[in-house]
Amino acid sequence: MIFIDETWTKTNMTRLYGWAEVGHRLVDAVPHGHWNTSTFIAGLRCDGLVAPCVFDGAINGEAFLAYIEQVLVPTLRRGDIVVMDRLSSHKVAGVRKAIEGAGARLLYLPPYSPDLNPIEQAFAKLKALLRAKAARSVGALWKALGDLAPCFAPAECANFLRHAGYFWSS
């Protein structure tokens, strides 16, 4: 199974919590004003993140179809099940055909059920790591994403699936 989703990343991401000595206020710089947003798309298998890709700004159906055809499909194996939410850009013409043309099946999650998509947990960890990196330019953000994508161990990815209720036997 491969769970597909996208998440936003911004050049103004900063840690939300921190430590300071007792009696002292924690002070940190937080960028205000102009920042750039990127969209990170990836798939989650039980053994790691696959087909990671970054887009400048938000994506639409055309960009998502290009991701499916050019990035995801080459990683698919016959018999794979691709699972994604019901975002309108995920249902554009050509997405199902491209996935099924690779010998995989496409399933959509029920509406309003992010808890059934284990990649959400991976994205939560990814965003925490990105906040710690404090990338302030698009280039630095994209490099950080590239550096962090391989940081997800197979056991950790399997636990994300297990936590979302997906079980399998070896």
Predicted regions and their residues:
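Short functional hotspots at interaction and active-site rims
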Residues: M1-S170
